[in-house]
């Protein structure tokens, strides 16, 4: 039986995406039957909730998870199926990832469904997404609700100017989804100030935006009242300073790296002057701000090349990524200025900028998983075109191989 019309020109893309998904499935199926890495902390919170109830669990000194209640709520709901045991619990994030791809496809309804879906799966080309998808971590459930918020808010922007029952419903549901995302990862709280700024672009719809903001805060503020802060009380003993420029540099670098895998043309088409200035700035910032002992993809590099050589390679790679990060920041600003009259693009760019800046306040450590939370809006901003089939397939292959290797190193950590 022949492939249906919409898929005929997309055979290569379909084969590549299927291969990447099968690789992810194989990694989960063969994953350890013990909890690994931060799964201990997050499943530990879930078990505390089941034993002690929500309030006591969220305030308990035994809670080593800094995330909110969305993750344990989802895993408790699915516990009759997963029994809170690996590898079954890891399928939850895989399902959330499929949901994210479907929602991103809905954000571009003017295009045929086949290219939209395959383009969404280009996210698997981003190597540091693989641990978040293949393990029972907190990023994907929150990303699913945040992507739902983005879809609803974009529809709100395109809706009628007057506050009709339809726009009220969109604003209410969008706020509810954003609040749920914040309950999954507090990082999404930075989108609320972005919505406040966005009201200057949506003056005729300010009431709808305000409803969205109020509902999102109503959905999540109880948690911060309970904690008397943005994280559990014990977490503040870990964080020592008020900000980290090194984390900001890491964040820009990882956002740039993700863009290179999604759509390198969006980033690389710059004048020579921009590259020269960015290279000087990137290496200077890396020298003064980066920690030599904490390079990008440290686990993979140390496992592959040994401690000393792996750290040296990581520092060089970090300098290159810092350069590209500076270029990424400049390109994002240029895109914002060029599309400043498009409320939908302004919304996406403000949200993206806020999420990329947020790790600067996470001073205890930096993790590439912080950038996973902005991959949905990054995808909507930069796109993932399928036209250059061989280059696209090459990026998917390289990214998936690296992602598989990174996920494997995570599975080796007790």
Q: What are these regions, as identified by a protein language model?
A:
Residues 23, 40-74, 157:
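Extracytosolic helix-loop segments that constitute the early lumenal/periplasmic catalytic or substrate-binding loops
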Residues 91-111, 148-152:
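Transmembrane-helix motifs of polytopic, lipid-linked glycan transferases
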Residues 36, 131-142, 366-368:
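Short acidic/glycine- and proline-prone juxtamembrane loop motifs at membrane-interface regions
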Residues 119-120, 164-185, 192-197, 215-220, ...:
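Membrane-interface alpha helices of multi-pass inner-membrane proteins
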Residues 193, 197-306, 314, 407-412:
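Membrane-lumen/periplasm interface segments of specific transmembrane helices
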Residues 65, 69, 73, 81-99, ...:
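Loop-to-helix entry region of an early transmembrane alpha helix in multi-pass inner-membrane enzymes
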Residues 109-110, 149-170, 200-205, 386:
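Membrane-interface transmembrane helices that cradle and orient dolichyl/undecaprenyl
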Residues 13, 104-126, 143-144, 162-165:
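Transmembrane-helix signature of polytopic, membrane-embedded enzymes
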